[in-house]
């Protein structure tokens, strides 16, 4: 039994383990609103390119 067989016994189709950032693949701090699916770190870098404006 290898390490992968122990921890990845079944595929993740729902929950936090199934989703990741479409830019870096990170699974924490994910912004899913408006179908973005981008982590908050990448959102801060790419928000101007996506058309979001900073008001403060």
UniProtKB/Swiss-Prot annotation:
InterPro entries in the cross-refs: Ribosomal_uS14, Ribosomal_uS14_CS, RIbosomal_uS14_euk_arc, Ribosomal_uS14_sf
Cellular component terms (Gene Ontology): cytosolic small ribosomal subunit
Cofactor(s) this protein requires: Zn(2+)
Assigned keywords, A-Z: Metal-binding, Ribonucleoprotein, Ribosomal protein, Zinc
Free-text comment on the cofactor: Binds 1 zinc ion per subunit.
Parts of the chain that traverse the membrane: none
GO molecular function: structural constituent of ribosome; zinc ion binding
Keyword Ribonucleoprotein assigned: yes
Binding positions (Zn(2+)): 21, 24, 39, 42
UniProt cross-references to PROSITE patterns, sorted A to Z: RIBOSOMAL_S14
Family: Belongs to the universal ribosomal protein uS14 family.
PANTHER family xrefs: 40S RIBOSOMAL PROTEIN S29 (PTHR12010:SF2)
Record protein name field: Small ribosomal subunit protein uS14
Organism: Guillardia theta
